[in-house]
């Protein structure tokens, strides 16, 4: 009975999650779009295959896979993964993560990845607090931003990071995303759904995959 209750609770928790979260890719094989970065022989694919990842910033519009890509990289490389949102985190939060990372080095733990969403919202002081840890390699920073990093990220931090541009999802990728969700999502796949308004949905989403899935 206890096992059944646990499984049932997990199903309810999953059902309560937005479709975009339920369909979040767990590997590059399921990742849609951005082939100029993750396709065979491309820069991020080579970085992952080599197991050596340097700090970088992902710049692109909403819903193009910035957070998902960071999560996949951490998973593929089996790195500890810390997430901070620039909207709700401060210098104290950054320092706490860095202290944890420094403590883990004594246990031969791989350098953690620190993912900062909306890094352009960090103040100069908040960005300054990252510099030493990034320079020493205490953490590998992956920042995500919808704004031009040249204007929003301080020069000393920007000089320590590569910047990779993510593009809006192409129509074919978004069509594939709809088909995959209908076929593979645990709940949608049981309802025999046929999507007749793909064009309208894709147009309304504006190339934002997250928005598209949540419309569905």
What does each model-identified segment do?
Residues 196-210:
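A short helix-loop-helix "switch/interaction" segment in the helical subdomain of ASCE P-loop NTPases
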Residues 120-159:
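Conserved catalytic/switch belt of AAA+ P-loop NTPases
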Residues 15-17, 46-84, 100-102, 131-132, ...:
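Walker A/P-loop
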